[in-house]
């Protein structure tokens, strides 16, 4: 696994062995970032269930301003991969329960332009992640949440204020793009 393009292009990323981490494949990441296009540039990124950090580090390599990477078990791997890519200055690693970190980020008043969420497949956390991010108001008004799930899992078309706007399947993975809709009623 490697960074595909940008300032850290070609940098190999370390991956944990036997911890149940399922890194997003290079091909899937390449397609994802092609769809995101210029949205990545200067973005504030949050990577939930970060694992190896490949998604956030790819975004930073492509010009994102800052990224927060959250994972319960792979903190040392995240730090090593940020060091390898020379992106430590703009990568903030947080170790702990994803939902606890979502609450902490909300308490700090943080918002993000781009949120990646890649919970373990078939764990049933997809709706919970959307609900937690929505309740914490972490997504900026014009932001995008990208949810990776198993291809066989049910697609969540609406959850709270989130609506699915696009989905693509890549092998065993399905990438769902969700926007946050707010009511402008006076």
Residue ranges and their predicted role:
Residues 1-183:
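Class I S-adenosyl-L-methionine-dependent methyltransferase catalytic core
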């Amino acid at each position: 696994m490697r960074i595909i393009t940008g300032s850290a292009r070609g940098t190999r990323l370390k991956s944990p062995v036997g911890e149940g981490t399922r890194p997003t494949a290079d091909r899937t990441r390449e397609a994802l970032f092609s769809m995101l296009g210029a949205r990545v540039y200067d973005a504030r990124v949050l990577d939930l269930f970060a694992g190896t950090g490949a998604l956030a580090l790819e975004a930073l390599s492509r010009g994102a301003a800052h990224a927060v990477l959250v994972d319960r078990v792979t903190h040392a791997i995240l730090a090593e991969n940020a060091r390898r890519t020379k992106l430590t200055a703009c990568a903030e690693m947080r170790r702990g329960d994803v939902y606890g970190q979502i609450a902490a980020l909300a308490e700090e008043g943080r918002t993000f332009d781009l949120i990646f969420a890649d919970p373990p497949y078939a764990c049933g956390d997809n709706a919970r992640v959307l609900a937690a991010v929505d309740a914490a108001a972490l997504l900026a008004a014009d932001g995008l949440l990208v949810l990776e799930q198993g291809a066989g899992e049910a697609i969540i078309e609406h959850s709270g204020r989130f609506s699915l706007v696009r989905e693509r399947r890549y092998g065993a993975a399905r990438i769902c793009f969700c926007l946050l809709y707010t009511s402008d009623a006076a």
